[in-house]
Amino acid sequence: MAETKKETLAEKVKRLSRGLRGSLVDSLKDEHTGSLRSDDQLLLKFHGMYQQDDRDRRDERALKKLERLYSFMIRLRIPGGMIGPVHWEALHNVAGENSTGTIKITTRQTVQLHGILKSKIKPTIKAFDSVFLDSIAACGDVNRNVTCTSNPAASPLHKEVFGYAGEISRSLLPKTRAYYEIWLDENLLAEKEEPEDPLYKDVYLPRKFKIAIAIPPYNDVDLFTNDIGLIAIIENGQLLGFNVAVGGGLGTTHGNPDTYPRVGTVFGFIPKKDILRVVYEIVTVQRDFGNREDRKLSRLKYTLDRLGVEFYKREVEKRAGISFESAKDFQFTTRSDDFGWKQDAAGNWHYTVFVENGRVCDEHGYNLKTALLEVSKTRRATFRFTCNQNLILSDIFPKDKDLIESILVKFGVHRKTAEVSPIRKNSIACVALNTCSLALAEAQRYLPSLIDKIEPILSKHGLSEEPISIRMTGCPNGCARPYISEIGLVGTSYGKYNLHVGADAEGYRLNKKYKEDLDESAILQELDGLFGKFSKDRKGKESFGDYINRIGILK
C-alpha cells in the first residue's frame, strides 16, 4: 500500500480557508488582543500583510506581564514598481497617519509600511483602494510582485516590456474575492458558491513564487535569483520575445545542508505572443510537483533539481503546447542603478534618487520624505521603485525638469545622491530587527554605520571609487539577495555574520561563504586583507568579485 503523505499545518490551513477567508473577520473584531489567531496569521500573508511585534520591547513588556506589542506590515502589489504622484501623496499620508511614518522600498520594487495596529488595517487598505492600490498576493504562497527593469531610459522598448509585468501579474492573481469582502466590505452573496480558482485551486502554491523581467544589458532586477526570469530579446528595434530562466532562489536555513541558493537555468527562447501561456504553465508544474511536505524544500529550485531540468522543461512544453527554441544571445553588464538625470529616446527625463536601504523618511536633518511629497504635489513626475531599493522620479517633460531639479536641490537630495560613495550606492539591507520575526541580527539599522567604517579601508587601498556590491540580511532567508553580491553578510546571531564573497558584478554567479560568525572587528579585518590583495593583484579593471573568484581562496 502506498504511503499516505502527512498534510502539514500550512497546507491544511490553506485548504480549509474558504478562499483565504479563514476566521479573519472574527480575528479583527477581537479587541482583547492586538494579535490575530494563529491560522489567520498565515492567511493574512495572501492579503499582503504580516503580523509582527516590536522585538526591542519584548523583555520590557514581559516584565510587565503584557502581551507583545503587535503590529502589522502591509506590502503593496505594484507590478514593475511604478505609481503616479497621486498614489505617492496618498502613500505619504497613510504612512504618517497609520504606520511608523517610514516608507520602505523593498528589494522587489514595491513599498511596505510597518507598525500598523490591528484597528488601522482596514482604514489603511481602504485608503489605498481609494487611489486604486492594493496588497493582494504581495505575500503568501502565490506569485509575488512581478519586477521589471526600472529605468525607462534603458530602452526605447521599455514601455512595451514593462507592460508584461502587469499582464503577468494579472494573469496569476488569485480569483477569490476574500480581499474585497474582508477589507473593503464587499457584500458576500451567501447563496452563490465561489468557483474554484483554476490556477491555485484550494491549496495555492507550495511556497512563494517570484518573477522578474530584465532588458539587457541591465540586470537591476537580479534576474537569475527568481523562480522565473524573462530576458527581453530585442533585435532591429523590435521585441521578439524572451529567454526564459527557471529555478532561481536564494533562501537557505542555517545548519540545513539540504537548503541552498541557486541561480536560474535558461530553458530557451519563447516568442512574445506565447510568453503568458508559458509562464502560467511553469507555475502549474510547480503547483503540482512542488514539495508540500517540507516548506524549507518547497521552492521551485528544489523541484527543478529533484525532477531534473529536462523533465520540468518537457512538462511545461506539453502543458503549453509550445517548444522552447534555443536561447538567443544576450549580455548583462551591470546591476547598479544609474543615478542622477537620464534622458530617454522620447526626450523625457528620469532622475534616480539614492535611498539608503530603501528607507524614505525625514531624519538627521535630511528631509527626503518631505522632498518627495513636494515633487508629488507638482504632478509632474511619476515614481518608480528599483530592486536596489532606490527611487526614480520619471517621465518628466523637458519643460518640467528645472522645477523638479529645484526641489531636489532645495532639500539636499541632489547633493546626497551625487556625494554618496559607490559602495554605499551598491548596498542593500533587509528590514530585520526590530520587526521581522525571523531576524537573528541587525541589517538596515546597522549596515549604514558598518559602511562608514568600510569606506576608510577602501580609501586606504585606493579603492574608494570601486562599485563593490555589499548586502546584509538578518537571517539566511536571503531577502536582500546577499548570496549573489560581491560582499554578502548573513546574520547568524546578534552582532555576528557569515561573510560571503566572490559573486560577479553582473549577477550571473553566486558568492561563497568565506568566514563564519564574524563580529564587526573581524569583518573589517577580513575585508581589509582582501581589499589590500585586490588593490595590488587585480588584473586591469577586474571586479572585486571576479578577483576573489580567480585567486582560489573559496572552497
From Swiss-Prot:
Highest taxon listed in the record's lineage: Bacteria
- Reaction catalysed? hydrogen sulfide + 3 NADP(+) + 3 H2O = sulfite + 3 NADPH + 4 H(+)
Keyword Secreted found: no
Q: In which pathway does it act?
A: Sulfur metabolism; hydrogen sulfide biosynthesis; hydrogen sulfide from sulfite (NADPH route): step 1/1
One GO cellular component, as annotated: sulfite reductase complex (NADPH)
Keywords on record: 4Fe-4S, Amino-acid biosynthesis, Cysteine biosynthesis, Heme, Iron, Iron-sulfur, Metal-binding, NADP, Oxidoreductase
A Gene Ontology biological process term: cysteine biosynthetic process
Coiled-coil features, chain-numbered ranges: none
Its subunit composition reads: Alpha(8)-beta(8). The alpha component is a flavoprotein, the beta component is a hemoprotein.
HAMAP family under this entry? CysI (MF_01540)
What is the protein name given in its UniProt record? Sulfite reductase [NADPH] hemoprotein beta-component
Which organism is this protein's natural source? Answer: Leptospira biflexa serovar Patoc (strain Patoc 1 / ATCC 23582 / Paris)
